[in-house]
Amino acid sequence: LLLVEPLLENYPQLPAAVEAGVKRVALADNLAVGGTTISKGVMGEAVRYAHEHQVSLDVVIAPRGGHSPYNDVELKMMEADLLEAQQLGVDGAIFGALTLQHQLDQEALRPLIAAAGGMTMTFSTAFDQIRPQDRGTAVDWLADQGFDHILSTGLANEDRLADWTMTKRLTDSVGLTLIPAGVAAHEAQEIATQLGTKILYGKKVLAL
């Protein structure tokens, strides 16, 4: 059974996604800039609605559009948002942080990981910026820290499938799940079959 996790912008799309039969959704604000954290009010209502319909809710945790590195103030915001999400009963958090050298920002990530306690953790598509030769070390560290999933668009390579296949080999070896991101509904089944994966993610993975 193929599990699709649509990335929705705020609350209004949530009922339609639930109606379409999804079992897991991700929510963010400002998708035009890559997605930022939704407000506390939206988060609370989304948790209530999702759980009433036996749907699992992930939220994107990002203080602004654009890529990391994040500064200290932005990291404090992310930490506070993670604690808030945890208290409101959100099921999972999607976040990431890299250094200017496109390495995992371990120092920034540690307090975020602590704040996400009790939720599943998915490393964001920032993973795509990590150089291929550094990905193995990154995946090992993320697994050690308790991450569950890694999102990747596969766009670091001209051949998405080759990129996903390489990353999946790494994630499989340490018990992490690679979730292909940026997948459109019309190609979902084919990609899932080719990769041997059961979960896909994206703004267009569900035709709403």
Q: Model features per residue range: what roles?
A:
Residues 22-35, 82-101, 145-160, 183-187, ...:
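Glycine-rich phosphate-binding active-site loops on the catalytic face of alpha/beta enzymes
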Residues 31-32, 64-67:
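A short, flexible beta-alpha/helix-coil linker loop
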Residues 2-8, 25-27, 55-61, 93-95, ...:
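Hydrophobic faces of well-ordered beta-strands that scaffold small-molecule active sites
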Residues 11-14, 31-56, 72-75, 98-117, ...:
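Active-site-adjacent beta->alpha loops and helix N-cap segments on the catalytic face
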Residues 21-23, 51-53, 89, 116-120, ...:
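Short glycine/proline-enriched coil/turn segments at helix->beta-strand junctions
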Residues 10, 63-65, 99, 125-127, ...:
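Short, flexible active-site-adjacent loop segments at beta-strand->alpha-helix junctions, enriched
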Residues 2-20, 26-30, 34-35:
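N-terminal beta1-alpha1 ligand-phosphate binding loop
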Residues 9-20, 66-84, 128-145, 165-202:
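Catalytic cores of alpha/beta
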